[in-house]
């Protein structure tokens, strides 16, 4: 049997999973990762703790699997995106805590860029909106606020990377300073048409090019792990940002296929194929995981400009499963997150109650930072069960709004709306939520047999570059649905419910 090791470095934990060649989980290990909150709106990680926890889980997963490192064909890395690390090339020590993707400290600099009229040019090159979410503005802040950082960067003494780059650096004992196109595309510094760092964007944010890692396709040779770390050197063969990795792990390889990850928030991606398309409906365009060129197509897989182009439309919901956490921890309405399904199931519907969980504003496709959470439609007959059901349904409403926006963009480009939605993430195990999602969308919702699709995507990318697999067609044959939720609701009723939702959104933003 041949094995693959996936490192899944997330915001709240570091995990490692050993997969067999059929994409089945053999063993896994996980450690929580603490977040640091220096002041309101600021979120940081200790980069050394990211590294220590990830290495520890990799060793633990191999031990649980009962295999030696030389039985592993390749390592794949999936990581939280946008989180920014800056370190000293000589010592390998970070010069500051990592600035996490949720961190908003760079918003004033982003507002200045918008006021200066750069939004159109940046979106045309990167597919992104100007926002503190993305790495470029975080890196600019570090260079401007860490004493001596800008001068050291200009002397070539520092290295920048998203979490994947940091892990590759540590895994190879500083021999490789690399990233992949899907992570690079989240920096607001990569021209996604050329897969190269854009000199104009670097100059605009005053970022020395010497800081930047080399960009490779997502399935490529990222070097070998140092032999002393895992007991044997293993090729790092696949790297992707977590959401693009999940899209790959869901076997969404062709235009029009889509997945939604139901976690603390929700992340929906629709594959665009090789066609770059900006959204007219509040969505982002980003690079999907990209493969090395086919034989004869170029000079080698280390040339990102020659990668097989693949793009995705993306929308993010700020509050998904977090609304259940709020019911548990904030209202103490339930004792465990798992208890919400039984409570919601105790009533046939939400009884006209509508919840808009805009605790931190509304993300795509609305982009209403001023929105605040609301519960409407309450009557004397409303119960805690109705509120619980409305909270659960709010996740589906927000996701439906995303998919409808994607459908409008797809049709405008001459394509067709999404015909099925593949789902993953912790909340996808909730049958009531998945059925209501299918009812709202009017298309099947498919839950895979392996819901750890983020790690699986990284493993598949590593397997392709190491010739364990030979094509995405082969991977598509491995994908299996554990359950298929067919829509049961009359379409007129579904449209009526969505109209009620949009009315509730307008109320939540009427400030």
From Swiss-Prot:
GO biological process, one term: glycerol metabolic process
EC number: 2.7.1.30
Transmembrane segments annotated in the record for this chain: none
SUPFAM superfamilies assigned to the protein according to its UniProt record, in alphabetical order: Actin-like ATPase domain
Positions bound to ATP: 11-13, 264, 321, 325, 426
Binding site for ADP: 11, 15, 264, 321, 426, 430
Full protein name: Glycerol kinase
Taxonomic lineage from the root: Bacteria, Pseudomonadati, Pseudomonadota, Betaproteobacteria, Burkholderiales
